[in-house]
């Protein structure tokens, strides 16, 4: 991972883990993607990945109960000159252990309902990191910008 040398833009928000708040996070994701110069289709995919992670936190982390989620979106410039859009999520749901053992590969031709969220997130993002904390979880999703984006 290249060290970050500058933060070009940053948005932070705290939301309840409820379906009413998903639109807030989608809007933040799309706004940051537009500020980064992403093409609309790619920005929409990125917002969908953010939506999917939030849905997973609500459904699996908080099991539909009350909770909160902190999200920070940054547009960073690495020391190597590459720009990337980073989304960091922090929840206070029970810790998820062994995330590295979950199968995030595409499922082939047989598609079953459910279980595709992490596959989608990994397909859209260049980096997906999970950290189990004492009192919750931290997720870091990053996507590198193409040279033509934001030029």
What are the roles of these predicted feature ranges?
Residues 67-76:
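A conserved short beta-strand within the histidine kinase catalytic ATPase domain
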Residues 79-114:
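Glycine-rich/acidic phosphate-handling loop/turn and adjacent ATP-lid/helix
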Residues 95, 134-141, 145-147:
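Glycine-rich nucleotide-binding loop
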Residues 110-125:
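Glycine-rich phosphate-binding loop
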Residues 29-51, 110-112:
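Conserved short strand/loop->alpha-helix "switch" segment adjacent to the catalytic nucleotide/phosphoryl-transfer site
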Residues 52-56, 123:
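Conserved polar catalytic motif of the HATPase_c/GHKL fold
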Residues 126-131:
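Glycine-rich ATP-binding loops of the HATPase_c
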Residues 57-61:
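Short helix-loop "hinge" at the ATP-lid/N-box region of the Bergerat-fold HATPase_c
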């Amino acid at each position: 991972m290249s060290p970050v040398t500058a933060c070009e833009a940053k948005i932070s928000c705290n939301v309840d883990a409820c379906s009413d708040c998903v639109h807030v996070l989608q809007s933040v994701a799309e706004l940051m993607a537009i500020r980064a110069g992403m093409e609309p289709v790619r920005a929409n995919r990125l917002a969908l990945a953010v939506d999917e992670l939030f849905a997973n936190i609500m459904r699996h982390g908080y099991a539909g109960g009350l909770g909160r989620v902190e999200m920070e979106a940054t547009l960073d410039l690495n020391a190597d000159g590459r720009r990337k859009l980073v989304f960091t999520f922090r929840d206070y749901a029970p810790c998820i252990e062994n995330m590295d053992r979950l199968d995030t590969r595409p499922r082939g031709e047989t598609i079953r309902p459910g279980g595709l969220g992490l596959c989608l997130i990994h397909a859209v993002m260049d980096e997906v990191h999970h950290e189990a904390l004492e009192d919750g979880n931290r997720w870091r999703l990053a996507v590198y910008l193409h040279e033509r984006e934001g030029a």
